[in-house]
Regions:
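Charge-dense, low-complexity intrinsically disordered segments
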Residues: 27-30, 34, 77-81, 157
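Short alpha-helical functional segments enriched in proximate histidine and acidic residues
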Residues: 43-46, 93
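A short alpha-helix-loop-beta-strand transition element characteristic
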Residues: 27-32, 46-60, 102-104, 176-179
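Gly-rich Lys/Arg/Thr-decorated short loops/hinges at beta-loop-alpha junctions or inter-strand turns
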Residues: 24-28, 66-75, 146-148
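Residues forming the flavin
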Residues: 1-15, 56, 79-233
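Glycine-rich active-site loop/strand segments that organize a redox cofactor
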Residues: 2-36
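Terminal amphipathic helices with adjacent charged low-complexity linkers/tails
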Residues: 55-87
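N-terminal amphipathic, basic-rich helices that act as targeting or association modules
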Residues: 34-41, 49
Length: 233
């Protein structure tokens, strides 16, 4: 993010690389992380071009804030709806291609199985959730972008269908399952406030970087936490 380091606090590709490696407990693949750090500016530019309304300072430049234990303020945000606005921007860009006829979209479909031909993925079997019909889709290349499996945990900010079913279908057909510990769940998320909400809400990470801490609502709950911690360790 050094090219967008408007506050001039000596941010660089290497500092972003190091923070990401450290945040991954030094288990991440360094080549991939460094490439991510290199193209991070381009990713922000692409999001802006898609219409993501990132916050700006009074001079009109994109604003930054501290987030996730980083050494410097390098996080671009859109009020308290950053993730949602990123999704809206991505879906809007995709829908423009759908309208042009260059991309076909099949909403309300659930992946049931992966199709292999001579050991290579060549398509999927899916169910139409509206009609219940089983459909098949062939392709020269198959990319599984299922959003992880964070919803196997009781509290998670992942979407409700991020339940591990797609990863399991691929694993059954011989795909390697690497680093299952890399799961982001945010157990301190806020419960849903209505039947129409498909995921929980995160507040803890940004508040922590602003110096806030989580405390029990009742004083006596502190002892319960300490006793539970003592038994755990």
């Amino acid at each position: 993010m050094q090219q967008k380091n408007y506050q001039n606090d000596n941010d660089s590709v290497y500092r972003l690389f190091y923070d990401t490696i450290k945040g991954g407990d030094y288990r991440s693949r360094e080549a991939n992380v460094y490439r991510l750090a290199e193209v991070s500016n381009n990713i922000i530019d692409q999001c802006v071009a898609q219409g993501v309304p990132f916050a700006r300072d009074y001079g009109g430049l994109l604003d930054n804030r501290s987030f996730g234990g980083a050494q410097v303020s390098r996080t671009f945000y859109a009020r308290g709806q950053t993730g949602q606005q990123l999704l809206i921007g991505a879906y809007a860009a995709m829908n423009r291609q759908v309208a042009k006829g260059t991309v076909k979209s099949y909403p309300r479909h659930e992946m049931l199985d992966l199709v292999l031909v001579n050991g290579e993925a060549k398509g999927i079997i899916a169910r139409n959730i509206i009609t219940g019909e089983i459909e098949r889709f062939g392709a020269h290349a198959v990319v599984i972008a299922s959003g992880g499996y964070g919803n196997v945990y009781f509290l998670s900010t992942n979407a409700m269908n991020s339940n591990g079913s797609s990863a399991w279908q691929c694993y059954k057909k011989g795909a390697f399952f690497a680093n299952p510990c890399f799961a982001q769940i945010h157990p301190t998320c806020i419960p849903v406030h209505g039947s129409q909400q498909s995921k929980l809400t995160l507040m803890s990470e940004s508040l922590r970087n602003d110096g806030r801490i989580w405390v029990p609502k009742k004083k006596e709950d502190v002892e319960k936490i300490r006793k539970k911690t003592d038994k755990t360790f």
